[in-house]
Amino acid sequence: TDARQSNIPVVQMNEQYQLRISQHEIELDATTEIGVLRGLETLLQLEKNGKAPALQLYDAPRFSWRGVLLDPARRFLPFPTLLRQLDIMAAVKLNVLHLHLTDDQGWRFESKRFPRLHQLGGKQGYYTQQQLRQLVQYAAERGIRVVPEIDLPGHTTALGVAYPELMSQPGPKQPEKHWGVHPAVLDPTNEAVYDFLTELITEVTTVFPDPYLHIGGDEVLSEHWLGSAHIVKFMQQHQLADATALHAYFNQRLHSILQQAGRTMMGWDEITQGSLPKSVLVQSWRGVESLHQAAAEGYDTVLSTGYYLDQPQFAAFHYRNDPAPANRPLPDLS
């Protein structure tokens, strides 16, 4: 059954609060529990040696999506590390944990329907469904949503080790051990792929209640597609001019599967290369220009460019990356 619960934070959660500190009392007003949590975090930051400055403030977030992406797929992170990350996020009022669960280097989601995924793709570690449900609840108690990412159709070496019959070409034999973009890719002409994804995504929704499900969609190398005679024939039969058109065909099929599962598609900015509904959420990693282009086309967007914490930069560098700068107004699409 669908994992959605009443106590899970919603996308447009109300986080605003008012805090008044005088000589004799502290007053915190908020209309939601999450607003109270945010106000208490501010109070903790103001307190020093049992004292806090007299003030009156009204606080509400500028952006409704303030997230952190963790990548345990490439390097497995122990479960307590995920819980600690949620504590840290709550302290600085971040409200979305984007969990990158699958990639060429590993598969970290326990699938009871397709156990070979974690048995062969997660030998270095994976999270049980019980752990992930605990993570979702732990996050909810801190006003944080958890958005899972199942990367498709590329970044699928670990998937291909478990179910090679779903891939565009034979192999791979084992998950990748090195960083990089690898050629393994699902076969978008194989109906068994869509049957597999329908069951897998349904299973994922029983664990993660968030309305968004991230499907990756980035860095899809075309060599396995264009090097397969049956795929080239399929492209010709369906008037798909190139690999970009084939990728768009796959995304459209995947979008329908997500709709049937009651989820909204989210993906990296390459997914805008096809005609997908404007309900799709686009995450830009290639640059601010792709973010503004997607927004101009009517998509909601999330910016990752400029916020890569694995690329050591001064804090000033990150603060210069404004998702909505005043000198670059977005179009009024109302």
Label each residue range with its predicted role.
Residues 51-55, 163, 288:
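Alpha-helical scaffolding within the catalytic cores
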Residues 1-63:
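Contiguous, structured surface segment used for ligand recognition
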Residues 63-263:
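Substrate-binding cleft of carbohydrate-active enzyme catalytic domains
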Residues 108-112, 159-162, 277-281, 314-318:
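Short secondary-structure transition/capping segments
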Residues 20, 61-62, 207, 275-276, ...:
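Extracellular/periplasmic catalytic domains that process cell-envelope and extracellular macromolecules
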Residues 2-5, 24, 33-35, 75, ...:
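Short, glycine-/Ser/Thr-/acidic-enriched flexible segments
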Residues 264-270, 275-280, 286-334:
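Flexible, acidic glycine-rich loops studded with aromatic residues
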Residues 43-45, 85, 300, 319:
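Short, solvent-exposed amphipathic alpha-helical segments in soluble enzyme
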